[in-house]
Structures are given as C-alpha cells and as structure tokens.
Amino acid sequence: MRTLPYSESVDSPSAPDPERARGGTETLPRAYLVRSQRERLLEAMLRVAAAKGYEATTVTDVIEVAGVSREAFDEMFESKSACFLEAYDAVFDVLVAHVNSAFESAAGQPWPERIAAGLSALVGLLSIESGIARMAMVEVTAAGDEARARYRAALARFTPFLEEGREYSNQGEELPADTARFAIGGATSMIFDEIRAGRGPELKRILPDLVFAVLMPYLGPEAAEDEMRRVVAASSP
C-alpha cells in the first residue's frame, strides 16, 4: 500500500540519524545536499506537527529532528508556516493519488461503486497514518489563514471524482452548482470529527456513512442508503 510521505514513526519526533547529521557532508554536491536537507526538514515538520500539534511546534523542534542547521532552514523556508504548507501539499498529493488509483481500478463499475472504492482507499490510508492524518485534517486549521485556504483548495482536488454524479443522477442539471463542494464538505467534516476525537485509527468504521454523505445529494436518500448497505455487506466477514 502506498503510504503518506515521510510517514515513518510519526507518533513521536525522534532524534536525527547520525548519518544525516551535518558532519561529513561537505564533499556532497550542493544540489544533492540542499535537496536532502529540504526533504529531511519536511519529514521532520510532519513528524513534529503530528506529534505536538502545529501551534506547539517550533522551528527548533524541526531542525533538531531533521539534523539540519537553523541557517539551512532559513535559506529554504521563510517561516515555520512555509515549511508546514509545503509538507502539507506533499501529503495531499499522495492522498489524491491514492484515491485516484482506487477510483480508476474500479473502472467499468457503476459510479457509486467507484466512489465507495475511492472513499475506502482514503479512510484506509488515513487510519494507518493517523498522526499525519491529524496534521492534514485538524492541525491545519490552527496554522493560519493561508493554511486554511490551502486546506479548502486541497479538498477541491477531490471534485473531479464527483463530476460523473451529475450524469448518473436523475436530477442532472437541476443539481446546484455547489453540489460537489457540499458533498465533500459533509464527508470531510465527519472525518475531521473522528480524528479530532482521537479515533483516527478507526476511520474505516464510518465508511458507510461517508458513502451515504457523498452520494445522497446526487442519488437521493433511498438510493444512497442502498449503496451504504452494499458497502456494509461487502465489508462484513
């Protein structure tokens, strides 16, 4: 299974690997060194923010975990927020790609079943990477206006998966223009509540509810409930 970037041991920040430390790096090409340092800083930001929360995270925390100097950090990022946002974008790149892979793997199936496959992939990955899931879905709301705008833009990247819903729906063009945004908002609010309550590892439990929330605006309550029951039956032992 594909995992989120920099996701190893995110439950608690760890000391840097001695081989990553600054000593002995002078002979490496500068382009390689800068790239390596940047990746380590992004990894450290994810680890620390997942463990401590964004507000409690400091640049000192990040550079200590990364094994990178403050000078190097300042050369690459103008602030803690800038580092966080770049790491955040990397996380959502993987989330969207993971959903897309599941959606495309179900090609040939009815649209509601492909939606269920994509949602199953999403909650499966988030439940495994619950620390980073908290950073991506909850801590981002504490990271300032730009981060919240980035969060809204990230959620909008799931809209293309819902476009076929208009063709599949009996209501068709009568559906409001913001139907996809409302459907995504309803589903992500449930995910947010579960993660904030500390139930990130149990996200698969709400998969049927997520399927209903996304499909209901397009199919109506009865058809969406039928699909929800199908998901429950498919996941039963």
Please give the residue ranges for each predicted region.
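Basic, helix-initiating cap at the start of DNA-binding domains
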Residues: M1-K52, D61-V65
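C-terminal peripheral helix-coil segments that are non-catalytic and often amphipathic
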Residues: M1-T25, G124, I128, P160, ...
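Alpha-helical DNA-contacting segments of helix-turn-helix folds
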Residues: S36, R40, F77, A82-V94, ...
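Pre-recognition alpha-helix immediately N-terminal to the DNA-recognition helix
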Residues: R40-V48, V94, A117, A121
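Helix-turn-helix
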Residues: V48-A82, E86
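Hydrophobic alpha-helical connector segments
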Residues: E86, N100-I128
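Amphipathic alpha-helical packing segments from all-alpha helical-bundle domains
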Residues: D145-Y168, A177-S189, K204-A213
